[in-house]
Design a protein with these regions (language model features):
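N-terminal positive-inside, membrane-proximal cytosolic segments immediately preceding the first
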Residues: 1-2
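Hydrophobic membrane-insertion alpha-helices, especially the h-region
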Residues: 5-21
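N-terminal amphipathic/hydrophobic interface segments
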Residues: 19-51
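N-terminal beta-strand/beta-hairpin edge segment
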Residues: 41-119, 126-134, 138-151
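Soluble extracytoplasmic domains of inner/organellar membrane proteins
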Residues: 113-195
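Extracytoplasmic/luminal low-complexity segments enriched in Pro/Gly and acidic/polar residues
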Residues: 185-231
Length: 231
C-alpha cells in the first residue's frame, strides 16, 4: 500500500513539475526562437509570467517583456526594441501549425523601437545604390545625410534632409530637400530625384500593433506603437 501511495505521490509531483516548470519553459523557448527568426537577431531576452505558470503553455500570459538588440522589421534596422504586454493571449494552435506568433487578445501591448544614425545609414546605402560615403545625423529637427554620388559622369556631393513619418500605418523617410553640388553643373536642388523611402508596410507590423508616435532626438528616432485594447 505504501509503495502504491508513494508511486501516486511521485506521479503527482512529476505532473506538477511538468505543468509548473517544464511546459512553460518549452513555450517560452519556442516563442523566443520565433522572435529571433522574425527579427533577424540572436540578442533577445524574453520574460513571460502567468499565475499559475502552466497558463503559459496554452498562450495565456499575464505579463510579457521582450527586449531585442539589433533587430530588423521590414527595411527598418532597430538598435533596440522593447515589447511589453499585459493579459496577452497567443494563438497556440496557429503557433504550432505555422510558427506564427499571432495575438488573439491583449489588454495592453506596446512597442518601443530605437533607430540610430548607423541604422539609418544602412537603410540609405541599401535603398539608394548610387550613394557612397554616407553619413547620417539625427536631431530633433529631423535627418540630415551627406554622401557622394556620380552625376553626368562626375562625382557630386549631396545633402539630403528629411524625417521619419507614418502615413496610414506605413513607415517611411519623407524627403524634404536634396541638394547636389557638382563642379560641372554648379549647385542643383532636385527634391524629387530619389523620392520617399519606404521602411515598413502597415501589414508588416507584428501582433496587430499600430504606430502611434515618432520622435526625433539627438542621435536617434524613437518609434512607438500600440495595439488597441480588445473588448
Amino acid at each position: 500500500m505504501r509503495k502504491v501511495l508513494l508511486g501516486f505521490v511521485i506521479i503527482l509531483a512529476a505532473v506538477a513539475l511538468l505543468a509548473q516548470f517544464i511546459l512553460p519553459a518549452i513555450a517560452t523557448s519556442a516563442i523566443k526562437a520565433k522572435v529571433v527568426s522574425r527579427l533577424s537577431t540572436d540578442d533577445v531576452d524574453v520574460s513571460m509570467q502567468s499565475d499559475p505558470n502552466v497558463l503559459l503553455a496554452i498562450g495565456d500570459i499575464d505579463k510579457m517583456n521582450i527586449v531585442v538588440h539589433r533587430a530588423t522589421i521590414g527595411a527598418v534596422y532597430l538598435r533596440d526594441l522593447t515589447l511589453q504586454g499585459k493579459k496577452v493571449h497567443i494563438d497556440m494552435a496557429s503557433f504550432l501549425e505555422d510558427q506564427a506568433v499571432s495575438v488573439s487578445h491583449a489588454e495592453q501591448l506596446s512597442l518601443r523601437g530605437v533607430i540610430g544614425e548607423n541604422e539609418l545609414r544602412r537603410v540609405l546605402e541599401e535603398k539608394i545604390s548610387r550613394l557612397d560615403n554616407v553619413e547620417v545625423r539625427i536631431t530633433p529637427d529631423g535627418i540630415t545625410a551627406t554622401a557622394n554620388t556620380k552625376l553626368f559622369g562626375r562625382k557630386a556631393d549631396i545633402v539630403l534632409t528629411g524625417k521619419v513619418v507614418e502615413d496610414e500605418g506605413t513607415l517611411f523617410i519623407k524627403m524634404t530637400s536634396l541638394n547636389i553640388k557638382n563642379a560641372l553643373i554648379g549647385r542643383a536642388k532636385l527634391d524629387d530625384m530619389f523620392g520617399n523611402i519606404e521602411l515598413l508596410k502597415a501589414e508588416k507590423m507584428p501582433m496587430g500593433l499600430k504606430i502611434t508616435n515618432i520622435v526625433h532626438q539627438d542621435g536617434e528616432v524613437i518609434i512607438e506603437a500600440e495595439r488597441r485594447p480588445d473588448k
